[in-house]
Curated annotation (Swiss-Prot):
Residue ranges crossing the lipid bilayer per the database entry: none
Superkingdom of origin organism: Bacteria
Name of the protein described by the UniProt record: Peptide chain release factor 1
Post-translational modification: Methylated by PrmC. Methylation increases the termination efficiency of RF1.
Provenance organism: Salmonella arizonae (strain ATCC BAA-731 / CDC346-86 / RSK2980)
Length: 360
């Protein structure tokens, strides 16, 4: 391993021990904000510190085995130990490189998930419903909470658009690669000739930001309209103008929220989604400005981004970004998404590692 990387790991290991000592300090325990921040830092450093300790131990084992090679009686055993230790050292070095990759500060956050029907009319709305169900199943399996913020139902089922907040550990980091265009190829229920139709939906995943980090929005830049909500809600539906539509005039971003009966709650929800959308637009703009020649696996949520194709007649799902095809469509639609998410996360890590070695 390069001396520069070893030096970096030693510094992180020392910081881990320092933070551990600080967490036992009565003054820090009394300061809840500081204690929480240090607890987070400790958790982030724990894996790299533990892995580095294991790596150091293996280097000692290699040294011991090499010394034993000089003893004819011990040579055979030493060779076997040396081979095993070198293998383990390589594995730990790979793990450490991944642990050293720059972390996206948003990865641990909750996320807003938007699914929007694109080309394909009723069939696109039905597919948007299928996609939302797929993500809900995935969230359920990971014990995440799904809260619908706003939805507009399709005429024959599904959704023209649905926005949900997904809360839990590492939601954004896991779902961020879902942003982009999703195509479906299947025979619609209304198709009498049995012809396969192609429809499309767009998915956008944005981190939920803490209030302190939300972009500054000038109230003068907002147009706020109220209207009567439609959809489920029993006797209270259409009796009050509780639904909210907020338009951010400088960007043209529009957010509607009609899920709550209270206008204030709908407004608060709509503003949090608006803040996340503005932040996402600014981030995308920044990434484009830095736009390296390196490919960006993170979709923009744009229809032109073709992430995946779900082909029902063939039972096939294809991720076009990494040329991955699986004939496991039924499982995918039931929310078993790790087999699609994991390869793209690994590909992203490989790209980051390549960038890191170029810098060095």
């Amino acid at each position: 391993m390069k001396p520069s990387i070893v030096a970096k790991l030693e510094a992180l290991h020392e910081r881990h021990e320092e933070v551990q000592a600080l967490l036992g300090d009565a003054g820090i325990i009394a300061d809840q904000d500081r204690f929480r921040a240090l607890s987070r830092e400790y958790a982030q450093l724990s894996d790299v510190s533990r892995c580095f300790t294991d790596w150091q131990q293996v280097q000692d084992d290699i040294e011991t085995a090499q010394m034993m090679l000089d003893d004819p009686e011990m040579r055979e055993m030493a060779q076997e130990e040396l081979r095993e230790a070198k293998e383990k050292s390589e594995q730990l070095e790979q793990q450490l490189q991944v642990l050293l990759l720059p972390k996206d500060p948003d990865d641990e956050r909750n996320a807003f998930l938007e699914v929007r029907a694109g080309t394909g009319g009723d069939e696109a709305a039905l597919f948007a419903g299928d996609l939302f169900r797929m993500y809900s199943r995935y969230a359920e399996a990971r014990r995440w909470r799904v809260e619908i913020m706003s939805m507009s139902e399709g005429e024959h089922g599904g959704y023209k658009e649905i926005i949900a907040k997904i809360s839990g550990e590492g939601v954004y980091g896991r779902l961020k690669f879902e942003s982009g265009g999703h195509r479906v190829q299947r025979v619609p229920a209304t198709e009498s000739q049995g012809r396969i139709h192609t429809s499309a939906c767009t998915v956008a995943v944005m981190p939920e930001l803490p209030e302190a980090e939300l972009p500054d929005i000038n109230p003068a830049d907002l147009r706020i309209d109220t209207f009567r909500s439609s959809g489920a809600g029993g006797q209270h539906v259409n009796t009050t103008d509780s639904a909210i539509r907020i338009t951010h005039l400088p960007t043209g971003i529009v957010v509607e929220c009609q899920d709550e009966r209270s206008q204030h709650k709908n407004k608060a929800k709509a503003l949090s989604v608006l803040g996340a959308r503005i932040h996402a637009a600014e981030t995308a703009k920044r990434q484009q400005a830095e736009a390296s020649t390196r490919r960006n696996l993170l979709g923009s949520g744009d229809r032109s981004d073709r992430n995946r194709t779900y082909n029902f007649p063939q039972g096939r799902v294809t991720d076009h970004r990494i040329n991955l095809t699986l004939y496991r469509l039924d499982e995918t639609m039931e929310g078993k998404l790790d087999m699609l998410i994991e390869p793209i996360v690994q590909e992203h890590q490989a790209d980051l590692l390549a960038a890191l070695s170029e810098q060095e």
